[in-house]
A protein has these predicted regions:
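Surface-exposed, polar/charged interaction patches used for macromolecular assembly or partner binding
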Residues: 193, 197, 224-227, 231, ...
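Canonical tetratricopeptide repeat
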Residues: 38, 72, 106, 140, ...
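Alpha-helical segment of the N-proximal tetratricopeptide repeat
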Residues: 31-62, 79, 113, 140-147, ...
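Helix-start (N-cap) detector for alpha-helical repeat units in TPR-like alpha-solenoids
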Residues: 33-34, 67-68, 101-102, 135-136, ...
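Short coil turns that delineate tetratricopeptide repeat
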Residues: 30, 64, 98, 132, ...
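Register position in tetratricopeptide repeats
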Residues: 45-46, 79-80, 113-114, 147-148, ...
């Protein structure tokens, strides 16, 4: 009997041991998963997102069903702007915790960041139907309004939420930011002061206070708030970057450059710090040092448009035409132009060729630019470019043959029939000054408005109807811009401003009448991705050009026919009817973009019958009994009234709200 009892006990012990061992292993794994989760949460609190991702991934390796770890991993990817991956993980978390409203709210924020606004709206409504006063959902609903470019609705929503939660830091800051974006700086200041009063030791509140005060041009106070933010959290990168910008805007260029060195030492990929250091050196008249710094920055990220724009402007203003660095940076544009041309992106290729030729006008690559003009349907301009190459002594047999062939081909062109030279007859009828107010800085780039204004002015050079006036882009205040534009005889002047985040840019161009300073029009563009500065600037130029009446001059009259100095390249179309106005009698309207003249000054009509590349002819019809049409009279086509471009969601505001923790 004892032998059977001993055998039975041994069998039970052997059978139970694997189960106990497995249970012990599982418990240890769960304990380790919990430890990794806690470590990840602490790293999130320190905003150490990369380490937090590592901890949560290890947590989920040990316990794949850890709902909070899954949700936290999704939040980390959201903070790292990896929104697709964040959505993947938050939906896994949702399956593990279907009733968790925090997970549902996180999904809303991710959907908004991905631009899936309808899906985000449906989820917001679903949550509010269950919990009408869910604080996080109310915050998300306001961000959704901003994404849909409804800042007024967002302000009302945040204001209502603040009444329910008057001490909520995020709501107060959000309300301050949205109010500021609507132009109410005083109210925005009141809200951020309330947040400061209720959260006196919170470094993030001081950071946003510094931003809001800086946008109200209260730079000294803003520096104080940024300093307090760094006092409470010395390694807070956004406050350090903002402090560098504030020192720059306050004229403390040496200190701004020093802070940029600190930022670059910590993160060599911080392109805004390279950019700001280059600007600071330029303001200190250390152009060669600035060129060195910006050249290094371009080697770190050659696609940064702001750095390249400032670098090229500095090279143009402080080096000779023979400087080899010009040819080097011009070649970058030529290579990019060839890439666009291979993909049949003609407008983009033309832009890059022009940028390159601006740096190195005698480059042999002008030949490729000429060929692109020919393919675009401008043989006369193609011939002009080839003759320029001949004049420079860089023509070969192929170019010489092409000049001869196209010279013969154009022998029957209108300008030959009327025995005129289109190059000598070309005339730009609009004078436009492009400015940016000196205090206009975006969240990512100081003086962003003046950089964008420079790109816009360069693009206007290639508009055959517009003379962009060569004046200082940075103007201290509106009155100074108005005075300079008026005294220089500008028809209109434009003030450019920029808002941006790490991926998107929005440019606003406000046009004013040069004579009166009255508003003339507002133009908006929004672009995202690579080349966004270039594309957004082109959008502004396209809108501005389309809003201006077409103007030309009657050059030669032969009985009922007349030749004008505008053609296909200027947008002249066959069968279009133009007003013929007495020379020197028209003037710009006191407000808006228009030309005004009396019926007595309207001496006739011109119907276009034949359009050449740079000139056109048409049939004349007099206005009234007497024929008063003379060479030198102006030919005008009032621009069609088009629906102005709508302002898009403020990318800078969206970024500030998205990163608000």
């Amino acid at each position: 009997m004892p032998r059977f009892l001993i055998l039975f006990c041994l069998i039970c012990a052997v059978s139970f041991f694997p189960v106990a061992a497995a249970a012990q292993t599982q418990g240890a794994a769960q304990g380790s998963a919990a430890a990794y989760f806690e470590r990840g949460k602490n790293q999130m609190a320190d905003e150490n997102w990369y380490s937090a991702v590592e901890s949560f991934l290890e947590c989920l390796r040990l316990n794949p069903a850890h709902a909070e770890g899954t949700a936290s991993l999704a939040e980390c990817y959201y903070e790292l702007a990896e929104f697709d991956e964040a959505l993947n993980w938050v939906r896994k978390a949702k399956q593990l915790a279907r009733t968790n409203m925090s997970v549902a709210n996180l999904e809303v924020f991710i959907l908004i960041a991905l631009g899936q606004l309808d899906a985000a709206s449906s989820l917001v409504n679903e949550i509010l139907a269950k919990e009408p006063y869910n604080r996080e959902t109310l915050f998300a609903a306001g961000e959704l309004d901003i994404a849909r470019n409804r800042p007024s609705e967002a302000m009302l929503r945040y204001r209502d939420a603040v009444r329910r939660y008057p001490d909520d830091r995020r709501l107060l800051i959000s309300l301050a930011l949205v109010t500021l974006s609507l132009g109410d700086g005083d109210t925005a200041t009141a809200y951020i002061n309330s947040a400061l009063l209720q959260h006196p030791g919170e470094y993030r509140v001081y950071y946003y206070a510094a931003y809001i005060y800086s946008m109200n041009n209260k730079i000294t106070e803003a520096i104080g708030f940024a300093d307090r933010s760094l006092y409470y959290k010395p390694d807070y990168a956004p406050s350090r970057s903002l402090m560098a910008v504030l020192r720059y805007r306050n004229g403390e260029y040496e200190e701004a450059a020093r802070l940029c060195d600190v930022i670059i030492a910590g993160n060599r990929q911080d392109m805004s710090a390279w950019y700001l250091k280059g600007l600071s050196l330029i303001r200190m008249n250390r152009n060669q040092d600035a060129i060195t710094i910006l050249t290094t920055a371009v080697s770190v990220n050659e696609e940064d448009e702001f750095i390249r724009a400032v670098l090229e402007e500095t090279l143009l203003s402080s080096t000779t035409l023979e400087d080899p660095r010009r040819a080097r940076f011009a070649m970058w544009h030529f290579n990019k132009a060839r890439n666009y041309r291979q993909r049949n992106l003609i407008e983009q290729a033309l832009f890059e060729y022009r940028r390159g030729l601006r740096m190195n006008p005698f480059a042999a690559d002008r030949r490729e630019y000429a060929e692109l003009l020919r393919l675009s349907g401008y043989p006369a301009r193609y011939l002009e470019e080839l003759r320029f190459l001949q004049d420079q002594g860089v023509a070969d047999r192929v170019i010489n043959d092409a000049v001869e062939a196209y010279g013969s081909l154009l022998s029957n062109a209108l300008f030959k029939q009327w025995q005129v030279n289109p190059v000598d007859l070309a005339e730009r009828h609009w004078k436009i000054a492009v400015f940016s107010l000196a205090g206009q800085s975006s969240f990512y780039h100081a003086d962003a408005g003046s950089v964008a204004a420079g790109v816009i002015r360069e693009l206007l050079v290639h508009d055959r109807n517009i003379t962009p006036m060569n004046m200082d882009l940075r103007q201290a205040v509106f009155s100074q811009a108005f005075r300079h534009a008026r005294e220089s005889g500008a028809d209109y002047f434009v003030l450019v401003s920029v808002t941006e985040n790490e991926r998107d840019i929005s440019i606003k161009a406000e046009a004013f009448v040069g004579r009166t300073g009255s508003p003339a029009g507002i133009f908006y563009t929004y672009r995202t991705g690579v080349d966004r500065l270039r594309d957004a600037s082109r959008g502004i130029v396209t809108q501005l050009s389309a809003s201006l009446p077409i103007r030309g001059r009657l050059l030669i009259r032969k009985q009922g026919q007349a030749l004008i100095n505008k053609g296909k390249a200027d947008g002249i179309q066959q069968d279009t009817v133009y007003d013929v106005v007495k020379r020197g009698r028209m003037q710009t309207a006191n407000e808006g973009i228009a030309i005004i003249y009396s019926s007595d000054e309207l001496v006739g009509k011109l119907t276009i019958t034949n359009v050449d590349e740079e000139i056109a002819i048409g049939a004349l019809a007099r206005n009234g009994f007497f024929d008063r049409i003379e060479p030198g009279d102006e030919v005008i086509l009032q621009a069609k009234k088009t629906k102005p471009a709508e302002n898009t969601a403020n990318p800078e505001l969206r970024s500030l709200l998205r990163t608000l923790r």
